[in-house]
Amino acid sequence: MVILQYVNMKNRCLYCYKEIDDTGLHYHPQCAMKLFGMRQAPVLPYNRNNIEQLALQIIEKSTSITGVQPKLALDINRGGKNEPNKLTIVGLWGNFILKPQSSQYAFLPEIEDVTMKMASACGIETVPHGLIRMDDGELAYITRRVDRDATGKKFSMLDMCQLTNRLTEHKYRGAYIQLAETIKRYSISPMLDVQRFWELVLFSWITGNSDMHCKNFSLLEYPQNGYRLSPAYDLLSVKLVDKFDTDDLAMPLLGAGVLGDTPIVNFKRESFIEAMTLSGITYQVAAKLIVKQITCKEKWFAIIDSSFLSEELKEQYKSLICKNLEKLKA
């Protein structure tokens, strides 16, 4: 089991990372409202020991890095008089998804949360997310589902395996440009969503996310409108936690995919420009999208510095980003 050296981040909000005056709270009231829909966050009455056993009984696992975290669906059980609201495990269809610490890789929840916040900082829409303390003090990652409304009504959300008739075990097959063409086919705002898609692919490469496979992109049904690219989810810097990872992305940008164990590497500015223009984005717009992310570096570093990562991981993450941003300069 990984022994975590927790960062001393007392009096910091687990949603926005900023200071909290009240030492008894983990969130600002306005931050709790954004994530949980209530001004006081619910309690999570589980720890790693008992939640791992529950996860084995209930939820999926996969061979990907993201999959080493058990994922549990939760709902808020409203407390009675003088009792706190609690998050309880409900099986597959809860309104929240929880990812506790991994026994193999340290700081996965903290890495996923800071990466999601970095995506938001550069204009990428993300699902509502944050960190939450378990009853033993460990941090877990929590996100609110976007495929249902406040009443529990469910909306259709189809991932790229479903939209391209791929089996789940084939989620790494193909190329990103094929997914862009699928978006054009089904989205009500095809070129806007293609642009958003390539921004997310580019961000994933910059941040060392080599696990953005077909199931990590979805189209979400918006009532009275139609399908649009969903907010981003499952953003994790895989290369930060797995030093033996040989791929820079989950799939190539162009072509029909790769065979065998051929590494997916050697991306640079021209690689992304070519992929975007072949998808119908003009050269000028593609170049601006790249510059936009290059200019986010200082924002990203400020978020990393205020995060719950260890000092060592903070420096490693910034170094990884700098290395990739250098390859994007004209």
Task: Label every PLM stretch briefly.
Residues 1-214, 218-330:
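Anionic ligand-binding catalytic core segments
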